[in-house]
Amino acid sequence: MNSIALMNGTRPRKAGRAVVGVVLLAVLGALALAPWFTSFATQRLLVEVFTVFAMALAWNLLAGYGGLVVVGHQMFVGVGAYALFALSNRLGINPWIMLPLATAATALFALLSALPMFRLSGAHFAVGTWVLAEMLRILTLNNEWLGAGGGMPLEALGSFDRWTRNAGVYWSALITGVGALFIARLMLRGKLGLALMSVRDSEAAAAASGVSIQRAKLALWVIAGSITGLAGAVAYMNTLQVTPDATFSLNWSAAAIFIAVLGGIGTLEGPILGTILYFLLRESFASYGSWYFIGLGSLAIVTMVFAPGGAWSLVTRRWVIDPFGVRRDMPRR
């Protein structure tokens, strides 16, 4: 019986993951070559796709695994973007070299912001993150060193020709999206992932079993903030200009939340599927103006009512698949 179960269960599952791995490598190879056979407009769109995916994945980690519902997710976007622009312009250093520093600056901000934020919970925490994001927007709006209301251009990219600039930003976005997915998978398969899942299921039970709830949430907060900050920095390399109103816009949070809800909160596959659906809808119906936003809102409501687990849950109802090997099932006797 055990050998039959092994043949019918474990081996096919491993074979399936191997096939998924080969397909993913082929897709990544094709995407890496995109600058040589796609237009600048297509590359700019793909930069948006990869960076917004990373932001949505980070929000999904916070809400789906840490129970941290963030309404002010744009604060990480703004900190990462402004850190990159300020450091690159003021120091005159290649912005690609400064991306790790911008990520580190966002991680430091996340660590410091946890002090007041983690004193709040529930709705107060969600609103508190939005208030903090608004405070940052107002501070940059009145800071002449950061360009005040007019923002600042990314002057350090001016020395590169258009092809090199676009290709460099595109590859940075691709690495950001793939790297975010890799880090999320690595985290969820490790001890931190186990701790977060136990906290998500029951904080009382997790605490009783010896899990440090605050430490687990803090680690997740810093990791998700860093991913979002890096994505924000790369996203604004694509536009070559930052302004307080755009960078700290609530639209970033709205997009991340919509993608996570549509695809499936608490999964790695959900943000991937949600991002694809979001951009298909945007590119197809954005020209309809306010009706487009009404449609997005209605779709989100319908999804939450009829498919609370998102579009990915509709897939798993029909097929038992786990392409990233994150799902943890209870052992069967």
Residue ranges and their predicted role:
Residues 2-333:
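Transmembrane alpha-helices and adjacent helix-loop boundaries
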